[in-house]
Amino acid sequence: MKPSSPISLTSSSIARKARFSPYLFTLLAFILFVSVLYGEDFMCIFGQLEPNFVLPPSRTPEKNKKSEKLAFAIGKTEESCDVFSGKWVRDEVSRPLYEEWECPYIQPQLTCQEHGRPDKDYQFWRWQPNHCDLPSFNASLMLETLRGKRMMYVGDSLNRGMFVSMICLLHRLIPEDQKSIKTNGSLTVFTAKEYNATIEFYWAPFLLESNSDDAIVHRISDRVVRKGSINKHGRHWKGVDIIIFNTYLWWMTGLKMNILQGSFDDKEKNIVEVSTEDAYRMGMKSMLRWVKNNMDRKKTRVFFTSMSPTHAKGIDWGGEPGQNCYNQTTLIEDPSYWGSDCRKSIMKVIGEVFGRSKTPITLLNITQMSNYRKDAHTSIYKKQWSPLTAEQLENPTSYADCVHWCLPGLQDTWNELLFAKLFYT
């Protein structure tokens, strides 16, 4: 279609189109309202679509902005400050934020020093945004904010690692007889009795009901997700004040995903195959609907953590074929690096679904910054749940865990970003 000249509109042509103006005005007003009110959080998502995407500074005059103060916010960041865009800086003074031996809550799958990792280099890196500084993590402020409240991480084992990291960052300020941790099925609850506060983790790798919902036995190759079933888990999330969702890796079983239409109790199950992107889109829409129906935007905060990268293919960063995260002690220095495991098609789905939603939700855009950290995985330095074979012992790359992260380590920075976005919008 040939574009119209910018000066070709005559008074008659304007008159002919005048009957459309109310609809056009309404549409433009709505777009402007959403972009101003939630622009920061949604645009973080769009920035994720391309690793080198840089958000332009807002040109909207401050006096014309219609802002809504988010719950728990105590300040604002500079408009030019994108805390998710930056570089890793060596810091042996303020890192690590705690020692592995100081935190008894770290699971044996994440205690790399205890399981023989010979170096500590991965612990001495601090995230430095390009145009600003991250606010220092203030454990006292976090605990006082959580007084009488519930914070919950919902998702898979990567979100569980972030949950454990938060406990490690806070527990030293709580007297020994005033804290406890208990697991019941999918729910693990850390209680700070003195503060009448809980920090919780709920196992739901797809957020929706699935055949992988058992918190212990869930290694199922033929995964099935039930459509429209988020309330199966969501009833356990009601009443939470701060909630952090994640879901990604469990959807990545190939190009297709099995979706159950009906119930797992049906004798004849109606299971259909859909593209991974369409299945993930269904999950994102379900999550946003649940948030809209169950979270009070004036009193609560909702976060979504973007995909956590793996480093299973050394050729991605110029390594040898067959190489992975095993024995990696240096960072990836290419600022544009994007691992092949991070599907841009999925990030596009997130951008589309979140961008069309009016539900306020803050994206924790940890993907790019974590892409550089091939050194920070647990690798072989973790508890092995079954005896290693002679073949595995001869080839450590064959059983290296390039999904999960050592603690203390990278996931402490994820919580620093959560702290920054919670208190400084």
Swiss-Prot record:
Tissue specificity note: Expressed in inflorescence stems undergoing secondary wall deposition.
Please provide the record's keywords in A-Z order.
Golgi apparatus, Membrane, Signal-anchor, Transmembrane, Transmembrane helix
Q: Which InterPro entries match?
A: TBL, TBL_C, TBL_N
| Record GO biological process | plant-type secondary cell wall biogenesis; xylan acetylation
* GO molecular function terms listed in the Swiss-Prot or TrEMBL record: xylan O-acetyltransferase activity
Q: Where in the cell is it found?
A: Golgi apparatus membrane
One cellular component term (GO) for this entry is:
Golgi apparatus
Membrane side Cytoplasmic: residue ranges: 1-26
Tell me the protein family, please.
Answer: Belongs to the PC-esterase family. TBL subfamily.
Instruction: Give the free-text miscellaneous remark of the entry.
Output: Contains 2 motifs that are conserved in esterases, but it is unlikely that this protein belongs to the catalytically active pectin esterases.
This chain belongs to the protein called Protein trichome birefringence-like 33
Whose protein is this, by species? Answer: Arabidopsis thaliana (Mouse-ear cress)
